[in-house]
A protein has these predicted regions:
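N-terminal amphipathic/basic leader segments beginning at the initiator methionine
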Residues: 1-21
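Glycine-rich tight-turn/loop motif centered on a GG-T
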Residues: 2-5, 45-54, 83-98, 126-144
Length: 150
């Protein structure tokens, strides 16, 4: 079949476009990043991310309340621990910054969906994503550590 004119009936008006679209994006489809700093009280702007803040454990629920008010129903938490070491042990500390943030959020907002970042770069004193062996990340040792995080 050779078409000299492409049919555009599904694009002819706003109503039909809304009815036939394949993708819908709404606030409840979004995941909001929340940066939680164990050493912080209150919240502090992140210069490199305009409009974003680091929250202390005392204000993490405020961030979630703002999400819910905007229709966002989930977040991903990024932790900034007080203690950093070569293997990132604060990442699996039962009283770590993310573990405490999850408890606070779930106590107030049990239906709010919380995702956590399991990268260990923020927890290591060298900034790499796992335990080092010489100048390289030791993947096997790091995988063992990661099992402790989740």
């Amino acid at each position: 079949m050779e078409l000299t004119q492409r049919p555009r009936r599904l694009r002819s008006g706003d109503t039909i476009r809304r009815m036939c679209r394949e993708t819908r994006l709404s606030a409840d489809s979004l995941i909001y990043p929340i940066f939680v700093d164990e050493t912080l009280s209150g919240k502090r702007p992140i210069d490199s991310l305009p409009g974003q803040f680091q929250y202390g454990l005392d204000t993490v629920e405020e961030a979630v309340a703002e999400c819910i008010a905007a229709g966002v129903r989930s977040c991903i938490l990024f932790g900034i621990p007080a203690h950093k070491d070569a293997v990132g042990s604060s990442a699996w500390d039962a009283n770590g910054v993310i573990q405490n943030a999850i408890r606070k959020i779930k106590a107030t907002y049990p239906d709010f969906y919380v995702i956590t970042d399991v990268c260990m770069c923020e927890y290591t004193d060298h900034g790499h994503c796992g335990a080092l062996c010489g100048h390289d990340v030791d993947n096997d040792a790091t995988l063992e550590d990661r099992k402790s995080v989740v």
